[in-house]
Amino acid sequence: MRKQIDFSNLILKKTPNQYLCLPKGFNSLSKPHQLTSNYDVSARDLQSAWYKTVIKHRSVNCIFNDENSLKSEFTQLSRVFKFIDIISVEFIEKSHNLSSLAIYSRSVLGYYDFNVNRKRVIYWLKIFNRETKLLIK
């Protein structure tokens, strides 16, 4: 089993082939590229809804999904060259029925990714918000 990402201590590489999203106010060594929203649902329910939405996408596989740690990890093959990208997600319980998520998407190979990781995360969040219709605060 791969070591799971510790979002608080994550230090981004000096390469452009990665994309990090964190909840507002999340304490991390790295500055996120984007902030994530809050959802009116428990972190466990958010994890379940995220899994159901993301797993339907082209060449996505779940390689880790743990309800105790509230962490999941997915892989997706790039469209053109079939390189593997890794997407780590942590579901964060902010209070009773209020949660958010941290996402780190990155390429395994190469230096440039033509913004694939950024586009993926933005798209997944857009689809997730549209499909789940969870109230966002």
What are these regions (language model features)?
Residues 1-137:
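Ser/Thr-rich, low-complexity intrinsically disordered terminal regions
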